[in-house]
Amino acid sequence: APANSVWS
């Protein structure tokens, strides 16, 4: 899994 995730 990625270390960060972006939510908009």
Curated annotation (Swiss-Prot):
Q: Which residues carry this modification: D-valine?
A: V6
Residues modified to D-4-hydroxyvaline? V6
List the GO cellular component terms: extracellular region
Q: Which UniProt keywords apply?
A: D-amino acid, Hydroxylation, Neurotoxin, Secreted, Toxin
Question: Which tissues is this protein detected in according to the database?
Answer: Expressed by the venom duct.
* Residues the record lists as 4-hydroxyproline modifications: P2
Q: Which family does it belong to?
A: Belongs to the conophan family.
Function (record text): May act as a neurotoxin.
What more the UniProt record tells us is: The mature peptide does not contain cysteine residue.
Q: This chain belongs to which protein, by name?
A: Conophan gld-V
Its source organism is Conus gladiator
